[in-house]
């Protein structure tokens, strides 16, 4: 065996040792009920096979036919074992769908059933120390939940919203991501400094969280389009907020924030897309809504790898937990708007960022809406500005609220200063 081959084999042995060390982890056990799967990992000429069954991880015979084959290209192992691993190397799903030097083969539904276990396994094997950040003062008791009725084009819709902060101050409205709800912004809604400066809003969109389907719903598959989504947002801004607001949506919420800025700028005084996509293709898969897959396990795991490995584990768990509770088909249908319909190349030039201030926030560990995507959007909106967050992922407000707070403060200060020349940091 050559020196190079020996080095690869040694690195693979380190990775496999870490994966085996996760055997018996209580969370892994919770995420793998009924699972029995063989995983093969190849790098160069080295190969290892692991048997994963209901929380147990054991070596399997090298000659076994694996259910899932994972092939790591040159240099991938070294990056995976860095502390912290760089973007696109931080977890199983990041490696599978975002890393061009990795291939994963296996039955699609079998892979979907194993995703929760595999994501947790690789999360533990590639763990990094938590990144410290100044603690923010929060008062969750200051957040008030309300039930309201929106008069929308499709008829009246009862929704749940949360409101906090200084009544009558500049409105700051947070919009949640696909398949989730306003719990993602719990830390920002309770933030004392934000509440002193802004009137804070965080609604659950219809069919999400505590916003129930209308009684007139016939049970047909839920669908989301730009027109329907914008109608909901416009109704909330006009009927609940009642004056121009700063709109701060994340992911699909960022996409509709840009749509609103393009088509209804009179309702806004500032545009703050968090993790905005350019064209986020390939986000839909069968495991999100198939009777052969536990969608709660799958969908929570599918988003887990989008976060930074240095974000606090407890917050990352909460972010995934929200996704585990979505109604059947809602996440996948939301992605129909986010991943199939929304086109930043079409929408961004319609936003007049020279008159309406626009600041984009992009996390480096986000492979669904990357910093490069944000830069493309900025280039199409002269006057827009972008802040890159090198140590955060797709759910910055949820995965590490204290670290995100500084970036949010910076973005809000730029919005308050008015439109500006393009700048990227």
Q: How would you describe each model-predicted region?
A:
Residues 1-145:
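Feature captures hydrophobic
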Residues 282, 296-353:
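Conserved alpha/beta-hydrolase catalytic His-Asp/Glu region
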């Amino acid at each position: 065996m050559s020196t190079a081959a020996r080095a690869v084999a040694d690195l693979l042995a380190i990775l496999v040792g870490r994966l085996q060390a996760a055997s018996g982890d209580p969370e892994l056990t919770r995420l793998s009920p009924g699972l029995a799967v063989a995983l093969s990992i190849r790098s160069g000429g080295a190969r290892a096979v692991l048997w994963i069954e209901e929380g147990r991880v054991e070596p399997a015979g090298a000659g076994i036919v694996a259910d899932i084959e994972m092939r790591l290209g040159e240099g991938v192992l070294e990056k995976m074992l860095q502390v912290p691993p760089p973007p696109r190397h931080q977890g199983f799903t990041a490696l599978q769908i975002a890393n061009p030097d990795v291939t994963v083969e296996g039955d699609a539904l079998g892979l979907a059933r194993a995703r929760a276990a595999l994501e947790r396994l690789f999360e533990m094997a590639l763990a990094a120390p938590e990144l410290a950040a100044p603690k923010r003062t929060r008062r969750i008791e200051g957040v008030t939940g309300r039930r309201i009725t929106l008069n929308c084009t499709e008829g009246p819709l009862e929704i749940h919203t949360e409101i906090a902060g200084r009544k009558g101050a500049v409105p700051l409205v947070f919009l949640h991501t696909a398949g989730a709800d306003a719990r993602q912004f719990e830390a920002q809604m309770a933030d004392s400094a934000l509440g002193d400066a802004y009137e804070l809003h965080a609604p659950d969109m219809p069919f999400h969280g505590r916003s129930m389907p209308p009684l007139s719903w016939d049970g047909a598959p839920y669908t989301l389009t730009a027109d329907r989504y914008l109608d909901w947002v416009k109704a909330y801004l006009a009927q609940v907020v009642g004056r121009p607001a700063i709109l701060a949506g994340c992911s699909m919420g960022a996409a509709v924030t840009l749509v609103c800025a393009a088509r209804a700028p009179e309702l806004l005084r500032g545009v703050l897309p968090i993790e905005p996509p350019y064209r986020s293709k390939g986000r839909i898969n069968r495991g999100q809504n198939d009777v052969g897959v536990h969608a709660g396990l799958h969908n929570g795991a599918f988003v887990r790898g989008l976060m930074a490995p240095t974000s606090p584990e407890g917050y990352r768990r909460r972010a995934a937990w929200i996704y585990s509770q979505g109604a059947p088909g809602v996440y996948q249908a939301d992605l129909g708007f986010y991943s199939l319909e929304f086109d930043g190349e079409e929408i961004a030039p319609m936003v007049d960022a020279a008159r309406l201030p626009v600041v984009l926030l992009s996390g480096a560990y986000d492979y669904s809406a990357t910093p490069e995507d944000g830069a493309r959007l900025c280039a199409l909106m002269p006057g827009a500005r972008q802040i890159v967050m090198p140590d955060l992922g797709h759910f910055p407000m949820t995965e590490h609220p204290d670290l995100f707070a500084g970036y949010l403060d910076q973005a809000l200060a730029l919005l308050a200063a008015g439109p500006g020349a393009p700048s990227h940091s």
